[in-house]
Amino acid sequence: MDKNIKILIVDDFSTMRRIIKNLLRDLGYNNTYEADDGATALPMLEAGDFKFVVTDWNMPIMQGIDLLRAIRKSSKLKSIPVLM
């Protein structure tokens, strides 16, 4: 896998986002972005060229499962791998 791919980390807890970002960085993935819920993440995904999403399940405003459903409904986003 290309180490320069854009990865979006979605979690309402900033500490968890930082932990995931640090783990990815340790693996050589430095092109990471963050969102604090699905409602913030979805426009970022639609506007960006993200290749992978790591998301929490339980978040305010838009839960992870609802974000996943929106990603799978979108013809532009449906092929992006999502780790929950």
PLM region spans:
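His-Asp phosphorelay/catalytic-motif detector in bacterial-type signaling
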Residues: 4, 49-51, 76-81
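Conserved acidic carboxylate
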Residues: 11
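Two-component/phosphorelay signaling modules centered on CheY-like receiver
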Residues: 14-33
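Acidic, metal-coordinating helix/loop segments flanking the phosphotransfer/catalytic sites
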Residues: 34-52
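Acidic catalytic/metal-coordinating carboxylates
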Residues: 37-40, 63-69
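Active-site residues of response regulator receiver
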Residues: 56
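Receiver (REC) domain active-site loop signature in two-component systems and cognate sites
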Residues: 59
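A short, hydrophobic beta-strand element within the central beta-sheet of small alpha/beta folds
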Residues: 69, 79-84
